[in-house]
Amino acid sequence: MTQWTDLFLLMPLSADGLHGLLFVTFGLHLLFVLLMLGTALLGLLFFLHNRRGCDGPQLWSRHIVDSHLGLKSLAVVLGVAPLLIVQVRYSHAFFTATGLFSYAWLAVIPLLIAAFLLIDAFGHTMQARAWLAVFCGVLGVGALLTVPAIFTGALSLMERRGEWAAFADKDLGAGFAAHWLLRYLHVIGAAFVFGAAFHLFFSTADHPEKAVRLRNWLFGATLVQIVIGIPLVFSVAVGLDWPVIGAVTVGVAAAMLVLRVLRPAAPSSVAAGPRSLLILLPVLFVSMLVARQFLQDRSLAPIHEQAVAARQERAKELAPYREQALAAFTAKLNTVYDNGYTLYDGACQPCH
């Protein structure tokens, strides 16, 4: 007992080391989450489009949905590391926000189980029982879309300490609600962008005629992302500084170049997307991830530092009682328990 400590505030690495690990692990997790969401959304939309008799058999829709299995497995597995790192680095804010979000937070697991089972059933029934496929697909994708709503809400609340008391009183502030909605829509838009890009390069080899539709989805989703991103930036204006502004600027520039490459007047191959997308989309993804990391660290690091300072003050208050506590603790350690008298005094005597 050489120091008074709090296990939740101890960190196995330096803050910078944890930030680096969080950036890498969360980036990988988010990438596969976006691919998984985009695949589920596009698979359902293409299936419903074909149901109207526009494109004949559902072979390509089934091909899109079949890739969901591997993507969802990677998304779930890669999500463990960033979740654990956030619990260690920002324990006070994390456990407070998830406690306030407790019912929704606990619903994540059953929602994921239901979504994955329904989407698998959707893929297996789309050619045999179309009505059952519609039922499973709509419910499965709906359940899947609820999960990022919960996560973005919890993260938004975690980063806004001033909203904790109001949220506990069931008072959802207009600013917080708007930021939550914009953040959620931005995630869904990103899922369309990266899902369409993924299948543009990896699912059109045997169906080159589908590339045009995926290019259109990619163009439209990127344009919508820019529109949503403008008010989203204003919703975090308090935390803006030059590193964040620089990262956002790089991301916007990359998005504009993506639109230029994909513009309807641009020449294109029906077999695949422009190779420049293989550079522009990673730049767009990393730059926005950098901006998010800076914003999160700016808002959460002071909360952790305040908790550490409170622990140190508490340690000073308890310091005069340290010797007394150690004496009582040492007396207990010196007690011999392998005799009948001690066992009787400690266990039997209170009742007999």
What is each stretch, according to the model?
Residues 311-343:
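Electrostatic cytochrome c docking/interface patches
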Residues 69-137, 228-255:
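Membrane-interface helix-loop-helix modules in multi-pass inner-membrane proteins
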Residues 126-243, 247:
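Long, contiguous internal "core" modules enriched in hydrophobic/ aromatic residues
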Residues 342-352:
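C-type cytochrome heme c attachment motif
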Residues 1-26, 56-60, 82-103, 154-182, ...:
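Membrane-interface interhelical loops and short amphipathic "cap" helices
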Residues 267-297:
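Internal/C-terminal transmembrane anchor helices
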Residues 21-26, 58-70, 125-145, 212-218, ...:
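Alpha-helical transmembrane segments and their helix-start/interface "positive-inside/aromatic belt" motifs
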Residues 32-44, 105-121, 185-201, 249-263:
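Hydrophobic cores of alpha-helical transmembrane segments in multi-pass inner/ER membrane proteins
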